[in-house]
């Protein structure tokens, strides 16, 4: 061979393979295939290298390691080339060797597992065989007894039978548990005429059957019996037509019976020995290749009596019967196995049911634990101890309305202002002075998101529930102001906005003050319905409230606290009402109804008389030099005190839309008020003047007493020049210079009307967008002219922190509380001014 190897393992494998091929092709005399075993192509074979075609030579010696490369591989003269295996091939061969080792290990493990199973099966088979042997012995004993009885009764009839003389077993190797190969040879000799003529008729039959290890012993015994019986029957059938049966000369009847018994005993002993040998061979393990087991039988033909023939027939029948119980036993075993499997399945089902029940119990326990934890974590009621004001029993107490009355009322105050009473232990607690000597300071509890108007409503409700009187139930009739610990109003702070949240002032002491803008005419009809004051005492309540309003303004200047004082007119009115009540009790019911109607008619008349004494008449305004007319209508009513030297307060709206309140005397003129207001705010007196809310200009020589508490508006003659310095070239092409000098007059009703403006919004980095901005009393809307949605379509007025004009004409900016600011450009400068004023 021309190939040399370096690895010893590869050489061993090649030797093993060459031996296999050598054995397979030995008889065919194909030496060329042995030479071409290395899978070399014909082109790679060296034709100069001779090789021997003798079959007796071992060609595995041609493969030698590298160390002996100098020697010739064959008897030829030329030396083959040294072809070494590459490292990659070595790695592949090593990997293949490792894989083969792993496969061998797995096969060994499987074989061990199978051997264990076979041992268990063999043990079971041994137990079954022992039981069968015991049963067979019992049956044999019974059969022997019956045979002895029958032998005496039956007549002698000559027959021929075969007896197994020798049984030789040659176990060369361990047989497989599933296959047994037996070759049975039987020779029979038949007697003719009077003498015993032995004719050697050898019949060789090879019976190959594949059975399990559990039935090896039984099959061998059955084969011996069946072969013997068939040979005997065959010989008798052939001899019957030719020769009649003759009795043997030298054998007597009792000797035949004893000989048959001896042969049966010998057969049984041989069978037992064979079974024991087979069991021993199955237990012993060997790695040598398996070989078959050959069993030979020899037989002689003798004449027997009819009794012995019948006995042999019966024994064969018994053996057949013994085989039948074996099949029935196998069926019983299968049934038992099925029952066991069913029992196992039932046990598994029971276990599963038990597991399910346990899981359900665990789930129930977990649910119970969760319920207990939830019950333990439920909130505990916190009882807050609050101070309760003492009720004045001299005054009549009206019970609070029931839930039914609240539901029946279509316009209930609670429905309007919402439920502002917080649950126990939550919300805010405020200290509010009512100005009523009987009530004093109240501790009012409201929710955190309550507004000022809702807080006033809660204060009036608490005052009414505690039995207090003297306050109007309508929360719009009052304002809240900041005060000190003694209840004195702090003049540095204006009245709080009704729409603001109360949380901003939760740490302050507040005072309930009358609202000068509250219209008593419109609310007079609701005073008798809302409760808190009886209908007959409506005049008292109105008069007392009017006195409180006037006295509160006086006490604000003197800082003497918020304590109402009754004037002489009010005392007279109270005396008149008391007299009317006494008369109403004595008069019949008809007179009472008439008096009530008269009182209702007098109620608005008295209010008008009080207001008309301090109110500015239209003729007086028209007679002034300020340029008025007879169409003046005062928008708000203000009550003033009747004292001769009592100071008064007037509300003034400044040009920057801010509101201030200024104290004045009755004898002060309007021009003096203008001078003091402008000096305080560093404004030019010549560029400003006062107007009323309806836009009428007031004369400077008009005394303040004749205003009647009307609100004033401070208007600038040149508002744009003061806010921005504009040159004539800065005016827009569409507008004119007259827009800069045009005066703008606004009042609340006009400012609250919804109006839209077309503007251009300038973004942060330069791009512009067309927008339509709408303004009303509460909000600012942001719309697109292309009917597309905007990011924020509306925002509230109260969220605006600042509005101002820019240096460029027509530009203005809006800043919000969240820190965002936007720049807009109007079409004209006047529209920008109108937007800011609105």
From Swiss-Prot:
Domain RBD stretches: 648-717
Biased composition (Gly residues): 621-631
InterPro entries xrefs: CRIM_dom, RBD_dom, Sin1/Avo1
Keywords: Chemotaxis
Compositional bias ranges of the Basic and acidic residues kind: 310-321
Domain CRIM: start-end pairs: 441-515
Coiled-coil region: none
Disordered as annotated region, ranges: 66-97, 157-290, 305-336, 522-581, 594-646
GO cellular component, one term: TORC2 complex
Summary of the knockout phenotype: Null cells have serious developmental defects, because they are unable to activate the aggregation-stage adenylyl cyclase acaA in response to chemoattractant and are defective in chemotaxis. Cells are unable to properly polarize in a cAMP gradient.
Sample GO molecular function, one term: protein kinase regulator activity
GO biological process: aggregation involved in sorocarp development; chemotaxis to cAMP; negative regulation of phagocytosis; positive regulation of phosphatidylinositol 3-kinase/protein kinase B signal transduction; positive regulation of TORC2 signaling; receptor guanylyl cyclase signaling pathway; regulation of myosin II filament assembly; response to electrical stimulus
Composition bias type Low complexity, residue spans: 67-97, 157-241, 248-284, 537-556, 563-581, 594-620
Description of how the protein assembles with itself and partners: Interacts with activated RasG. Part of a complex, TORC2, consisting of tor, lst8, piaA and ripA. Additional proteins, such as 14-3-3 and heat-shock proteins, may also belong to the TORC2 complex.
Stated role: Component of a Ras-regulated pathway involved in integrating chemotaxis and signal relay pathways that are essential for aggregation.
Family per similarity comment: Belongs to the SIN1 family.
Name of the protein this chain belongs to: Ras-interacting protein RIP3
Organism: Dictyostelium discoideum (Social amoeba)
